[in-house]
């Protein structure tokens, strides 16, 4: 039996055990995991430093290095994320749609775990803790296949979580890390449909496409984040500037950072003059249509079909549009169904934007940076689904479950 087949089968076996574990016990285990991450913070950061040194030697892109980096604050955030998960309702076993048929048969729907979830990701060691905790609380085993860039960090975090599982006499196979980033093993992993129920890839466009095209297992896509801010003709321009700066400059290498700015013609002159000052101060590189480019020094002029880039850097694309409808059309053409933002004081326009724009998160007068499981009350997130089956948007506990029918009778037969 190959390594991958063995890991997958052990994960499936462990999932059956976890599915029957009560909420109180799961929460005790998770609290111990949070405490263990804090206690082993120095060990985790030391292992992460090895990954960072290799990343620098390999000239890894700045955005990827940022995602790879762990420090006291980020390890603490992982622990706090687990504690939030503890505070959330356990979806497993929840009942709804309780009905009784005319023949006396009673019908219910019950939430149940998916089974085995496989995470495929790049330089994101925090995914190890987030996915491990979310899958555990929702009753799923998880198989973690991180990129070579984060291998030591991921193994360190997993080893800490394994020590807690052992303390509670639970199998390590509940949280498995593929120890070798070899592409051939990844291909084999994506064929384990008898053991793995769902694959969630998190990373660049190339990784998402590779997994989607090669997996025989259902895939939920966490696609790139080409997020826009649309500044409406009725916008509060001070609010708009704050949304722009927070969305673009707070942390550039994340999928909920702004990559596009769409401005209504009626306020373009006043607003873009403000943008020219603040974006220059922040060192943001400007790509723009011919009209918007005139407000900026050294702007790169984009053609009509050259928008839609995920920069993951201090860089943004700007377009002036003649109407609300044109803004929605631009977002439909160049967005990635991740997060879209409108700044407006017009309630009717805001409501129409939220109904019209096809994105997993649509915000009004609030930063794109809130498109995150921790910010939306989900605790940690396992991903932000930009495809619509079977989840859409930040995925928390409920997204890691499905429903089955419970049918109870007292001897009825079908006539």
Swiss-Prot record:
InterPro entries the UniProt entry points to: Ald_DH/histidinol_DH, Ald_DH_C, Ald_DH_N, Aldehyde_DH_dom, G-glutamylP_reductase_CS, Glu-5-SA_DH, GPR_dom
Listed GO CC annotations: cytoplasm
EC assignment: 1.2.1.41
One Gene Ontology molecular-function label: glutamate-5-semialdehyde dehydrogenase activity
Disulfide bonds, paired cysteine numbers: none
Gene3D superfamilies per record: Aldehyde Dehydrogenase, Chain A, domain 1, Aldehyde Dehydrogenase, Chain A, domain 2
Signal peptide: none
Residues in coiled coil: none
Pfam families for the chain: Aldedh
Catalytic activity: L-glutamate 5-semialdehyde + phosphate + NADP(+) = L-glutamyl 5-phosphate + NADPH + H(+)
Pathway the protein takes part in: Amino-acid biosynthesis; L-proline biosynthesis; L-glutamate 5-semialdehyde from L-glutamate: step 2/2
Keywords: Amino-acid biosynthesis, Cytoplasm, NADP, Oxidoreductase, Proline biosynthesis
Subcellular location per the Swiss-Prot or TrEMBL entry: Cytoplasm
GO biological process: L-proline biosynthetic process
Family the UniProt entry places it in: Belongs to the gamma-glutamyl phosphate reductase family.
Function comment: Catalyzes the NADPH-dependent reduction of L-glutamate 5-phosphate into L-glutamate 5-semialdehyde and phosphate. The product spontaneously undergoes cyclization to form 1-pyrroline-5-carboxylate.
Family annotation (NCBIfam families): PRK00197.1, proA
Protein name (record): Gamma-glutamyl phosphate reductase
Organism expressing this protein natively: Pseudoalteromonas translucida (strain TAC 125)
